[in-house]
Amino acid sequence: MVMDTNSLRHIFSRVDADKSGSISANELQTSLSNGLGTPLNIRTVQLMVAMFDRDMNGTINFNEFLGLFKYVQDWQTCFRRYDRDNSGSIDLNEFSNALISFGYHLSPQFVNLMMRRFDRNRGSIAFDDFIYACVCLQTLTREFSRYDCRGIGHTVFSFEQFLTSAFAVII
């Protein structure tokens, strides 16, 4: 859904509860739902605000909000593509298919580990946790690639060992 600038300005002003001209992670969290009727995970919201906070002041202004809004829409489209049963969450099989389509060929054991790390004991991953899982995986992949000069998926340790260790630290 493409929205015009005036509509987005209206959304921005509604989310900007304190009328400061910028949106904090807490303000953004209260305005977004994960598709299961609960607010987005604050860690996901903080991650997204940090990604789009170009002036590094801890909040996003309207121009930064435009990028974040498109980013969330793109992730919603992706999420809906893999939520085949329209349950509002992605089960293990749907999550595995999404990761494969992103080019990740991980063992079933590792996909299970990711599922357990991001499902909040629900057995499925809601929209916000899907974003968080995918952005973490992309960030860690980018970091790993800096050291995997030959692009073979191994350095001093395997990719999955690196991810396992990193997930234990960041989650």
Swiss-Prot record:
Ca(2+) 3 binds at D83, D85, S87, S89, E94. Transmembrane segments: none annotated. Calcium-binding protein. This is Sorcin. Its main location: cytoplasm. It comes from Schistosoma japonicum (Blood fluke). Residues 3-38, 40-69, 70-105, 106-140 form the EF-hand domain. Ca(2+) 2 binds at D53, D55, N57, T59, E64. Ca(2+) 1 binds at D16, D18, S20, S22, E27. SUPFAM superfamilies: EF-hand. Keywords: Calcium, Cytoplasm, Metal-binding, Repeat. InterPro entries: EF-hand-dom_pair, EF_Hand_1_Ca_BS, EF_hand_dom, Peflin/Sorcin_CaBP.
